[in-house]
Design a protein with these regions (language model features):
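Glycine-rich phosphate-binding loop and adjacent beta-alpha segment
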Residues: 220-283, 322
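NAD(P)H dinucleotide-binding glycine-rich loop of Rossmann-like/cofactor-binding domains
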Residues: 60-66, 70-72, 90-151
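Short, well-ordered loop/turn sites that connect or cap secondary structure elements
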Residues: 84-85, 142, 231
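Mid-domain Rossmann-like dinucleotide-binding core that forms the NAD(H)/NADP(H) cofactor-binding site
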Residues: 122-195
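N-terminal Rossmann-like NAD(P) cofactor-binding module of classical short-chain dehydrogenase/reductase
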Residues: 92, 213-214, 238
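C-terminal hydrophobic helical "lid"/dimerization subdomain
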Residues: 225, 271-322
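Glycine-rich beta-strand-centered segment in the early N-terminal region that forms part
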Residues: 23-38, 52-97
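Short amphipathic alpha-helix with an adjacent loop that forms part of the alpha/beta core around
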Residues: 198-208
């Protein structure tokens, strides 16, 4: 079967490896025929050659791990050892081993859920990041009537903007150095700010500080501090971005004096929140169509990741389709 792996910084190689088959499935696992994958911002450090912490990320120049780093997948069930999945089901969710960039993917069935047949696989793969956003928003206060600021307006940050506005946020501020003014109305952003977060927070008036600040950048330590500085007294800061460092410096005095709450965490209860994402998408039928801006074939994985690494105001979600 076909598979891809990163063999050097910024370089994918297509290979042929032995097929995954039903004999390889453990209890609770599902074998998928690849239909589509989504490129996530958290995939990009691996593409750049950074060494991660997953088993098998041990190549000399890059990970050299089959199928890595894709975790957002849609596919058709070939075989199942999970009670809720059957051959022929079309499902979306997580490639639980972060090896979704191959023709046949083995994943934990508890991280997959069916999607509406009206959606193309490339559109459906957007349900996975939407599920993550909905789960994170469950951890926040009721957003009705609040000012919500999101640092980072990439594919995940724009979803946070959309969900916050749909939840009744009074004002949504989106901060990104890439110009997102063209996408702001469709994603519920009242105040699109084209600036780095340090510049934005340095010029904030007290009345413009937010009731909820969501960090949706990750992979460095600075933006968490900016989120804390941008929070109004009594506010909640949610750190969603992936933490590549073990220790993050924060202004604890500011946390204390402003009575702030800092939260973070990965997505749990994944089948349930995939179901919530499907319901949300049904109620907002324009969302996934607007969200998906670029689709590449499996013969151009390199092109998909090259685009993902370039600042582009027209790019939101990139999918790779079979």
């Amino acid at each position: 079967m076909w598979s891809y792996r990163i063999v050097a910084p910024y370089l994918f190689e297509r290979t042929s490896i032995p097929d995954n088959t039903v004999e390889h499935l453990a209890d609770g696992q599902v074998l998928l025929q690849f239909s589509a994958a989504g490129v996530c911002g958290s995939d990009l450090p691996a593409f750049r050659g950074n060494r991660g912490r997953l088993p098998g990320d041990d190549g000399k120049s890059a990970a050299e791990k089959d199928g890595f780093p894709i975790h957002e997948v849609a596919g058709e069930v070939i075989a199942s050892r999970h009670p809720d999945h059957r051959a022929g089901d079309r499902v979306v969710g997580w490639a639980s081993r972060f090896d979704g960039l191959m023709e046949r993917v083995i994943s934990d069935g508890n991280m997959l859920a069916p999607y509406h047949p009206a959606l193309s696989p490339a559109e459906a793969v957007g349900l996975q990041p939407l599920a993550c956003v909905l789960y994170a928003c469950e951890q926040l206060p009721d957003l009705s009537g609040l000012h919500v600021a999101i640092i980072g307006q990439g594919s995940i940050g724009l979803l946070f903007s959309y969900v916050a506005k749909a939840a009744g946020a009074r004002r949504v501020t989106g901060v990104d150095p890439v110009d997102r003014s063209g996408q702001a109305p469709a994603f519920g952003v009242d105040d699109p700010v084209r600036a780095t977060s340090d510049r934005w927070v340095s010029q904030l008036a007290p009345g413009d500080r937010a009731d909820v600040v969501i960090e949706a950048v990750g992979h460095q330590v600075a933006t968490l501090g900016h989120a804390i500085e941008a929070a109004a007294p009594g506010a909640t800061v949610f750190y969603f971005g992936v933490a590549d460092d073990e220790a993050y410096p924060i202004n604890m005095r500011l946390m204390l004096r402003n009575n702030l709450t800092l939260k973070s965490g990965v997505t749990l209860d994944r089948r349930r929140v995939l179901g919530l994402a499907a319901k949300f998408a049904d109620e907002h039928p324009e969302l996934l169509r607007t969200y998906l801006t670029h689709t590449f074939g499996v013969d151009d994985v390199q092109g998909a990741f090259d685009l993902a690494c370039r600042p582009d105001p027209e790019r939101i979600k990139i999918a790779i389709g079979a």
